[in-house]
């Protein structure tokens, strides 16, 4: 296995891109923050992209660097959004597995966020 890599997942959500992206940017309870801390590196509200750097003692046992990037684009008027979530990583050593479990947990989180937005009554 290589030390550096990237994993990416593409999926659709039912929410409009603006609402979904705003909810993600404003959320302070992202699941990948449980084992460390996150620092926002870049946010583009027009393009609906964001990159975060993850760190902390638990993460640093396995990864020298771990960054997540999201891009949200509208499918069409009232048709939901496409989401691309990518992790760029550098492992501490080659025997560490790629962070597939973090990707899987992230998708579950995004689906729950989508449902919460859809069920929210203003």
Swiss-Prot record:
Output the superkingdom of the source species: Eukaryota
Which SMART domains does the record associate with it?
Answer: Bet_v_1
| SS bond partners | none
- From the UniProt record, give one GO term of the biological process aspect: defense response
Cited Pfam families: Bet_v_1
Which PANTHER family does the UniProt entry name for this protein? Answer: MLP-LIKE PROTEIN 423
Which protein, by its recorded name, is this?
Uncharacterized protein At1g24000
Give the species this sequence originates from: Arabidopsis thaliana (Mouse-ear cress)
């Amino acid at each position: 296995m290589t030390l550096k890599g990237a994993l990416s997942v593409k999926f659709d959500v039912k929410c409009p891109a603006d609402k979904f992206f705003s909810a993600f940017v404003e959320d302070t309870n992202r699941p990948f923050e449980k084992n460390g801390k996150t620092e926002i590196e870049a946010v583009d509200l027009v393009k609906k992209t964001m990159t975060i750097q993850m760190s902390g003692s638990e993460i640093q046992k396995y990864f020298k660097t771990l960054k997540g990037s999201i891009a949200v684009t509208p499918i069409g008027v009232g048709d939901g959004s496409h989401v691309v979530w990518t992790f760029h990583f550098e492992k501490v050593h080659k025997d560490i597995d790629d962070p597939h479990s973090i990707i899987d947990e992230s998708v579950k989180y995004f689906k729950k966020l989508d449902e919460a937005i859809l069920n929210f009554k203003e």
